A protein has these predicted regions:
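The conserved Walker
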Residues: 31, 35, 302, 331
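Pre-Walker A adenine-sensing motif
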Residues: 13-22, 238
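Membrane-active amphipathic alpha-helices enriched in small hydrophobic residues
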Residues: 483-510, 518-545
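Conserved lysine of the Walker
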Residues: 39
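Conserved P-loop NTPase motor module
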Residues: 6, 104, 129-136, 147, ...
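P-loop NTPase motor domains
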Residues: 47-57, 64-77, 84-312, 338, ...
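Conserved ATP-driven motor cores of ASCE-family P-loop NTPases powering translocation/secretion/packaging/pilus
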Residues: 45-47, 70-90, 312-398
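N-terminal pre-Walker A segment at the start of P-loop NTPase domains
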Residues: 1-17
Length: 547
């Protein structure tokens, strides 16, 4: 809980209240412990405190339990027994509550328990407002991790994004918004690989095929619902309601079944916050607190380049007013370069059954500033549920001496809410309907499809034009061939007829016969020539028909 006297009150030890310093809340934190030791309740208590201080939070709800933060908590026997530890009360103020099994402080009870304003989100759009990002926003580095690409395939994906960016300079609609845009761009680059080889590098068909197969797997996981528009506006995570910070709860029970998609999505959110928010330095309170549950998923199978980027984002995002709190089983799940930046720590019990477990306990103990009152490593193994070793940063940013403490109980409901309650909260949200309908505007897929259609039409027209020219050429040759044959036939007929006439005339002169008239000779020449032409044309036509 939060009040002016104790600040962000999280736990209580024999020396008094243990609270997070608001100015140091953006220095990040860690909640660690074995399964069943109370990590989720601690997360809920922290989130409530930030909420009451007017700080919005984002958290992933793995089992649905965190949805209870939207409802007012109730007194229970367990809480009643622990109440005096956290809130010393004068017994004379006790009054009987008819709904309780024992006397309660009714007035105090009604003021103490309270709900938080909540918005539910869901990547799949089933249990909350949809959350989407475009392929371009996700970028090749995160997409490569998401698809599990090797170094060569990762290089090809970077080339495809670079070509898409360059093409977008010529055509602003050449955008990579959803998975079909990326698939179309991969096909396009593969088909024009030789053209781009000199400027961008080699793009092999095998690498493109591997990326296409990885895209199919992504679609099978439901990632196609995540990529697209309208893309999520991160400022919708940074709102208040009645002076309280809104708790943004991501339904992750289905999402966590795809660890790569879950961790990459949250990493994208962090990257968007880092790249979008302005520098503000240290503030009285953070602008946003980001709880990253199952944090080990973020660092599993992560390349050195991406790990460096994660470390950079975590190191620099605090100057944007954002605090990141990792939740995991053991501090050893977090790389040292990241672990060293987590100043506010709550360590629940760890079990040490194997040498590896014992080493993890020692590592966890070594991250705390020692307390001479107890041995840290032994205490970690003997903590009860709801107990933890706690160390927060002081006003100067130095870690305080570790204390064995009891975590405050949540003031909101512990456990999941009903589907009806969830639906009511979703419908009452100020952003209800903003992200519900996916928009599919013109982008790379449509542009490239249009280009392909135009090229296909142009190719068909060119082919048809060539066929027409070919037919014309063929027809011209045929006509020329017939005329040549006709001319030859006429020449032959005339020559042979003239020869015959001349021969007859010479013979008649010698024999003394009377020669036929010139007209008769001419008629004979014409008649023979005509007959020859007719026979030639007929033979040519019949020959073509037979062919």
């Amino acid at each position: 809980m939060y009040d002016k006297e104790r600040g962000l009150y999280i736990a209580h030890c024999p020396n008094g209240a243990l609270s997070i310093n608001g100015k140091m809340a953006n220095r990040h934190g860690l909640i660690a412990g074995a399964t069943g030791t109370g990590k989720t309740v601690t997360l809920q208590v922290m989130a409530e405190s930030f909420c009451q201080a007017g700080v919005p939070c984002f958290m992933a709800d793995m089992k649905g339990d965190l949805s209870g933060i939207s409802q007012v908590g109730k007194m229970s026997g367990f809480i009643e027994k622990r109440l005096p530890e956290f809130f010393p009360v004068d017994s004379s103020q006790l009054t009987v509550d008819s709904d309780a099994a024992s006397p309660q402080l009714s007035t105090f009870n009604s003021q103490l328990f309270q709900a938080c304003p909540v918005r539910f989100f869901d990547v799949y759009g089933e249990q909350g407002h949809p959350m989407r990002a475009t392929v371009s926003q996700m970028g090749p580095q995160l997409l490569s991790r998401l698809m599990g690409l090797n170094e060569t395939q990762d290089g090809v994906l970077h080339i495809v994004f670079r070509i898409a960016d360059d093409l977008a300079q010529e055509n602003p609609n050449m955008l990579l918004l959803d998975l079909k845009d990326l698939r179309a761009m991969l096909d396009y680059v593969s088909q024009h690989a030789k053209e781009y080889q000199v400027k961008y590098g080699n793009v092999s068909a095998a690498s493109v095929g591997a990326i296409q197969r990885a895209l199919l797997q992504l679609e099978a996981q439901g990632a196609d619902k995540f990529f697209g528009e309208p893309s999520f506006d991160i400022y919708d995570l940074m709102q208040t309601d009645g002076g309280k910070g809104i708790m943004n709860v991501l339904a992750a029970d289905k999402l966590m079944m795809q660890p790569k998609l879950y961790s990459t999505f949250l990493l994208w959110l962090l990257s968007e916050l880092y790249s979008t928010l302005p520098e503000v330095g240290d503030m009285e309170m953070p602008k946003l607190v980001f709880f990253f549950d199952e944090a080990h998923m973020l660092f599993t199978d992560t390349s050195k380049a991406l790990l460096d980027k994660i470390e950079q984002v975590i190191r620099l995002i605090r100057s944007k007013g954002v605090g990141i709190y990792f939740i995991t089983q053991s501090p050893t799940d977090i790389p040292e370069i990241v672990l060293g930046q987590l100043g506010n720590r709550v360590q629940h019990a760890l079990r040490a059954y194997t040498p590896k477990d014992q080493k993890a306990v020692k590592t966890a103990a070594d991250t705390f500033r020692p307390n001479p009152a107890f041995k840290t490593d032994e205490t970690i193994m003997n903590l009860e549920t709801g107990e933890a070793l706690v160390s927060f940063l002081d006003e100067k940013g130095a870690p305080t001496v570790v204390e064995r403490a009891k975590i405050l109980f949540p003031l909101s409901q512990i456990g999941a809410i009903s589907e009806g309650q969830r639906l009511d909260i979703i419908k009452q949200s100020r952003i209800y309907g903003k992200y519900d309908t996916m928009i599919d505007r013109e982008s790379a897929f449509e542009v490239l499809l249009k280009q392909m259609e135009e090229q296909a039409l142009a190719a068909a027209a060119e082919k048809e034009e060539k066929e027409v020219e070919k037919e014309k050429e063929k027809g011209g040759k045929a006509k020329k061939g017939i005329m040549s044959k006709v001319l030859k036939a006429v020449t032959t007929a005339v020559t042979s007829t003239m020869a015959a006439i001349v021969g007859t005339w010479v013979s008649d002169k010698i024999s003394g016969k009377k020669t036929k008239s010139r007209k008769s000779a001419t008629e004979k020449i014409v008649k023979n020539a005509t007959s020859s032409v007719t026979r030639t044309i007929s033979r040519d036509i019949l020959g073509n028909l037979v062919k």
